[in-house]
Regions:
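SAM-dependent methyltransferase catalytic-core segment centered on the flexible catalytic loop
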Residues: 97-155
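A short acidic (Asp/Glu
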Residues: 83-86, 100-108, 168-173, 197-198
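Generic recognition of flexible, low-complexity loop/linker segments
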Residues: 77-80, 145-149, 202-205
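Structural motif
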Residues: 91-93, 159, 217
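Conserved Class I SAM-dependent methyltransferase catalytic core
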Residues: 133-181, 188
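SAM-dependent nucleic-acid methyltransferase catalytic core
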Residues: 1-104, 116-129
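Residue-level detector of short, conserved catalytic/binding motifs and their immediate flanks
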Residues: 88, 156, 214
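C-terminal catalytic and target-recognition region of SAM-dependent MTase-like enzymes
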Residues: 169-221
Length: 221
């Protein structure tokens, strides 16, 4: 608390990285380890106790001096993009499914804001009761929101990451992008996240076979 404000972001970034590692989850914040209904480090089987309970140590960051200007916004991207200048390249990584990030990573927000007065409600994960979904989390609105985003992006190139398990079918996503320029589709080798250690091997293999990650590079014309 005595650290000058200009230095706090550097240490806070390091702390958030460590908190995302040393926590009572499987590595994904969709649920916390429990023994029955009561939270317990590592759950009933004491999984990953070393990772969860080992001390947090902040390492010296790698800092790069450059003259690039950075702009950060919490606004709706579909609104914000209408007011940005012409850019060479824009990269988008929209939500793939119905689960908004905010309900998973709310604890990181608490650490980031360092608000000790936040009341954690008695919900499934302790997530805030006032969380909101993005249009990209909706099977009804995702496609139209995505097309509006591409149409309003003032950039020479647009790079998008998505997978074939997302709300927007890959064929539909390609059709939208091809309306606005020349499109290159790039397959990405990607090992899917092991959702839980107890999942059967055959189910895990099926999951790996089903999910394919892609990059889409659009040269907007």
């Amino acid at each position: 608390e005595t650290l000058p404000d200009k230095y706090k972001p550097f240490l806070l970034a390091l702390l958030l990285v460590e908190v995302s590692i040393h926590n009572n989850t499987s590595g994904q914040f969709s649920a916390f380890y429990k023994n029955g209904k009561i939270g317990q480090y590592g759950g009933a089987k004491n999984i990953d106790l070393k990772r969860i309970t080992s001390p947090i140590t902040l390492e010296m960051p790698n800092l790069i001096k450059n003259s690039c200007k950075s702009f950060i916004s919490k606004n709706d991207t579909n609104v914000w993009v209408k007011n940005i200048p012409k850019l060479d390249l824009v990269y988008y990584d929209p939500p793939y499914n119905k689960h908004p990030y905010s309900i998973y990573y709310f604890l990181l927000n608490i650490v980031n804001n360092w608000d000790k007065n936040v009341e954690i409600p008695n919900t499934t994960r302790g997530q805030p009761l006032n969380w909101e979904k993005s249009l990209y989390n909706s099977s009804i609105h995702a496609k139209s929101a995505f097309e509006e985003l591409i149409k309003n992006t003032n950039a020479t190139y647009i790079l998008i990451s998505y997978n074939n398990g997302g709300i927007i079918p890959i064929d539909d996503l390609e059709k939208i992008l091809k309306k606005y320029g020349n499109l290159e589709k790039i397959n990405v080798e990607h090992k899917t996240y092991n959702k839980m250690k107890g999942i059967s091997n055959y189910k895990r293999n099926l999951e790996k076979e089903k999910i394919q990650e892609y990059f889409f590079l659009l040269h907007k014309t």
